[in-house]
Amino acid sequence: MAKTIAYDEEARRGLERGLNALADAVKVTLGPKGRNVVLEKKWGAPTITNDGVSIAKEIELEDPYEKIGAELVKEVAKKTDDVAGDGTTTATVLAQALVREGLRNVAAGANPLGLKRGIEKAVEKVTETLLKGAKEVETKEQIAATAAISAGDQSIGDLIAEAMDKVGNEGVITVEESNTFGLQLELTEGMRFDKGYISGYFVTDPERQEAVLEDPYILLVSSKVSTVKDLLPLLEKVIGAGKPLLIIAEDVEGEALSTLVVNKIRGTFKSVAVKAPGFGDRRKAMLQDMAILTGGQVISEEVGLTLENADLSLLGKARKVVVTKDETTIVEGAGDTDAIAGRVAQIRQEIENSDSDYDREKLQERLAKLAGGVAVIKAGAATEVELKERKHRIEDAVRNAKAAVEEGIVAGGGVTLLQAAPTLDELKLEGDEATGANIVKVALEAPLKQIAFNSGLEPGVVAEKVRNLPAGHGLNAQTGVYEDLLAAGVADPVKVTRSALQNAASIAGLFLTTEAVVADKPEKEKASVPGGGDMGGMDF
């Protein structure tokens, strides 16, 4: 395919037009009085959202240079969303301000590389200031306030705080659509996975269709169990101990399954067989998680363990196991606390090293099952459009709350960024690097000014007033009052603010140092063939 090339000023201006087109659509959503954006979908109802990254993803521009500019800013929003779960609109507003100021200076003759170095040093200084001024999140109320700001709804904030209180900071909080109105919170104690009993004959509570085992032994096998002679020696030992047995294996079939079922029906011996969750390496890892949680070992030929030689010391234990047709919950496994902590640390390390979103999500689920628990927030609404929008807001707020717990909070509303600007004078930079730092200084005002503008106030006046207030005091855009924002519950997670600034600066540096853009030439539409043109003039 033929390419089209643009150089220096023309190239940079083309990219900037694309950036502005996208940023102007996104920035109207910033702040408590920000508006929504309607996104048309090819199929189904349109989506209404105020989430920066969702809006950015939908924007496709026709001009090849503008398209590349917009794609670069999408990257800012997406990266911020991946790292912090929120702050995508702030990142976009910062990127636009940095690029606008930067290109003005490049056009005036400044050296782009000098500007880039100045921007990087200034961002490093601001990040340091943010982390130094962060306040740890200690109370349920602080978590609720932070989540409520992200979701724009206090009831959502309260529910997320309650969920985090129950499952711990490492716990997984998932959001599901509900057929009823309002919000509901469901909690799972212990480790739950999505596999139920292999046979309905294992049920101990016919009314609830559940198999409940109190204080059972837990046998974990990495292969299929099909012959009784392999299982018999171990079964006799378990029966002798007078306890029920949960078998988790790749599969339990044939005479092994029928023996377990017959003994259950006769009342001789209570047991339940369940298939192990996952596939391949993930199944092995999850079985190992269960072994550590319950204090047992996985019976696997890879490590030289076989069923016929197994004894009770290789079995795990738990206070209670509940198995339904779809899922199994292990409550209070008897595993060693240090071993569990070691496994948690190992999974955390794997999450940090993984560059696949899917793998990270699965590892996060495993981590939650070991370290915390699982909470499900069920959201309902009158229409499908409202339901999708609400679910999206709650998911963002959950990630926002987790980010707050991780690195602490600072005053929200764009105030912390603006009030961090004076610290840049300490850098003592010269020449184009000083100009680069000044670009950051100007850009730090952009989020606050945009929040003020979206609230119907004069941005310049608000920025000047906030600049002269004590640290942490600023405009509460929801009420229009100038006050101590942390005390008023207007807070942003440091991780969100920091990521927004770092990602915006990264893309701005690329914009400023661009000297040429190579893009695909737009294809001209081929003229359509007139009707009957290929028929040799024949009539039909």
From Swiss-Prot:
Question: Where do the segments described as Disordered lie?
Answer: 521-540
User: Could you tell me where this protein is found in the cell?
Assistant: Secreted, Capsule; Cell surface; Secreted, Cell wall
Annotated site location: Cleavage by Hip1: 13-14
- Quote the CDD domains the UniProt record gives: GroEL
Which EC number(s) are documented for this chain?
Answer: 5.6.1.7
Protein origin, superkingdom: Bacteria
Sequence ranges of Gly residues compositional bias: 530-540
Which Pfam families does UniProt cross-reference here? Cpn60_TCP1
> Where, by residue number, does ATP bind?
29-32, 86-90, 413, 492
The UniProt activity regulation field reads: Conditions that promote oligomer formation increase the ATPase activity. Chaperone activity is fundamentally influenced by the interdomain communication, even if oligomerization and the ability to recognize the substrates are retained.
Keyword Lyase set for record: no
The answer, when asked if Isomerase is one of the entry's keywords, is yes
The phenotype of cells or organisms lacking this gene is: Essential, it cannot be deleted.
What switches on expression, per the entry, is described as: Induced in response to heat shock (45 degrees Celsius), pH 10, hyperosmolarity and starvation. Repressed by WhiB1, activated by Cmr.
On modification after translation, the UniProt record reads: Cleaved by the mycobacterial serine protease Hip1. Hip1-dependent cleavage of multimeric GroEL2 results in release of cleaved monomeric GroEL2 into the extracellular milieu.
List UniProt keywords, sorted A-Z. ATP-binding, Cell wall, Chaperone, Host mitochondrion, Isomerase, Isopeptide bond, Nucleotide-binding, Secreted, Ubl conjugation, Virulence
The UniProt catalytic activity note for this protein reads: ATP + H2O + a folded polypeptide = ADP + phosphate + an unfolded polypeptide
The subunit structure is: Forms a cylinder of 14 subunits composed of two heptameric rings stacked back-to-back. Also exists as lower oligomers, including monomeric, dimeric, tetrameric and heptameric forms. Forms monomers under standard conditions but oligomerizes in the presence of high concentrations of ammonium salts and either ATP or ADP. Interacts with the co-chaperonin GroES. Interacts with the serine protease Hip1. Interacts with host CD43.
Q: What else is known?
A: M.tuberculosis contains two copies of the groEL gene, groEL1 and groEL2. GroEL2 is probably the housekeeping chaperonin, with the GroEL1 proteins having evolved, following an ancestral gene duplication event, to take on a more specialized role or roles. When coexpressed at high levels of expression with the co-cheperonin GroES, can complement the E.coli groEL mutant.
PANTHER family of this UniProt entry?
60 KDA HEAT SHOCK PROTEIN, MITOCHONDRIAL
What is the stated purpose of this protein? Together with its co-chaperonin GroES, plays an essential role in assisting protein folding. The GroEL-GroES system forms a nano-cage that allows encapsulation of the non-native substrate proteins and provides a physical environment optimized to promote and accelerate protein folding. Prevents aggregation of substrate proteins and promotes their refolding. In vitro, activity may be independent of the presence or absence of the GroES co-chaperonin or ATP. Shows weak ATPase activity.
Q: What does the entry's free-text domain comment contain?
A: Each subunit is composed of an apical domain, an intermediate domain and an equatorial domain. The two hinges that connect the equatorial and intermediate domains (EI hinge) and the apical and intermediate domains (AI hinge) play a significant role in the chaperonin activity. The N-terminus is important in determining the oligomerization status.
Q: What protein name does the entry list?
A: Chaperonin GroEL 2
Q: What is the lineage of its organism?
A: Bacteria, Bacillati, Actinomycetota, Actinomycetes, Mycobacteriales
